[in-house]
Amino acid sequence: MTEQVIIIGAGQAGLSTAYYLKRNGIDPLILDANPTHGGAWLHAWDSLRLFSPKEYSSLSGFMMPKTREAYPSRDEVIDYFGKYEQRYQFRIERPVKVLDVTKVEDTFHITTDNGEFLAKAVVSATGNFSGQFIPTFPGLERFIGDQVHSADYKNNTIFSGKNVAVIGSGNSGSQILAEVSQIANTHWFTNHPLDYLDDELDGRYLFELSTKRYYAAMKGEKLENTDDFSKIVMVDSVKEARERGVLIREEDIESFSEHEIITANKRIAIDAIIWCTGFKTQLNHLKGLQLNTDLQSLTQGTRSTQHSGLWLIGYGEWSGYASATIIGVQKHARETARQIAESFELIAS
């Protein structure tokens, strides 16, 4: 059987696109590598909370139910995704890992660990979680302490009493540092000076700023003063860490030894490293399509510039402003579904 549309991934981008496709009369099949609902949120650390209230953290059509606190927790997001799937009765097969996608004439052949699937259109919505990025430093291969990427960090328990280097800024770096510093001696290394949003601002402000940038770009204009996008959001845990005086940036890393990080002026004993250095887009599951390596030219909006019938959504700025966020991906999912529906109408005619 050849499906009209197959969506790869059942995170926020995949579910949002499925919702809008169903509104356009198309019932897509979703292939999800995870064993259950939740997308990348299944892999987030235990204490993670969104920094926007549920009104700014909901998928289209169904508001997130009331949460225990102002900002939804990781577990509440996972539970909400499950309710969303049930509400709209999406067809989802899991766990199914996509190994490759090829195209023969006008049909996509999707090779998985559970057989082959065929589709006339494919939406890749796998996110960036599998592309964990760790930078290189002189001597890093000599370091013999524990290392974990933020994608694999769960809680602070195993770091009790240790000297821990948190490498990387952003919201993951600040929040993990805040948690680990409660029971460990932490050192924070970032590649630029630390900068924070005002205490009263949260994700709502960033969404509104992103929306302004989106509409400015639609008009061919450029929104000035976008530095706030890179600033750290002052959630309660980070405010508390500030009060304890642990939000201190160390000197730049020059090299590593077996047990130390070496800077220009000191050697710092380190037992463990937590890498909060983000993710790189990983599209190995599409290798058979031989996509461009330049992400900026890979899509026009979310539509592939190389293959008709292929869309990529939710990977970050190159696939749409704020498209890696729950609320930000909605407008891109709506447009993606519209384009797909339109393509089938054109084929039918």
Feature annotation, model-predicted:
Residues L59-M63, G314-G316:
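A short small-residue
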Residues T36-A44, L48-G61:
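Redox-cofactor-proximal catalytic regions of oxidoreductases
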